[in-house]
């Protein structure tokens, strides 16, 4: 059967097992992957069809895979239209993201690192699309290491801008 597989069959199989992993193993560690229906909604609303697409909490790269499907549905090739950049805190998820892109025939620059503390891609002001479902359940954020302290977008004349945090 696998010798006669066509199209994105391996990608679909990988997504199936990734979803099973997300529903069991990942949640035990307090990590949750964004539901596919939400990912599809985000992609359909912002229509990321060109340039740099960045996900600062990319998990298993589901946003990128759905973006690839979106671009292909327009009759275009994702590799010719977009460049994916992702950052993921957990080492295992970083590996899952890279593998997910590979089995779907996509390429991207995925780095391991905590976005709260460091911007591995240095894309401030450069990304055409930023898609994320940030990890609201993050524990132990070290304020002293927070990248925000060095981010010129939130510092004004040596004083931090007052921010409103009303999710």
Annotate each predicted stretch with a short phrase.
Residues 16, 91, 150-151:
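N-terminal functional modules and adjacent low-complexity/disordered segments of proteins
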Residues 1-22, 31:
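Long recognition/docking surfaces used for binding and targeting
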Residues 1-2, 125-129, 163:
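Short, mixed-charge, low-aromatic patches
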Residues 75, 136-167:
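Mobile active-site "lid"/loop adjacent to the S-adenosyl-L-methionine
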Residues 28-132, 137-141, 146:
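Conserved S-adenosyl-L-methionine
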Residues 3-7, 28-36, 159-166:
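Short acidic-aromatic active-site loops that bind/stabilize oxyanions
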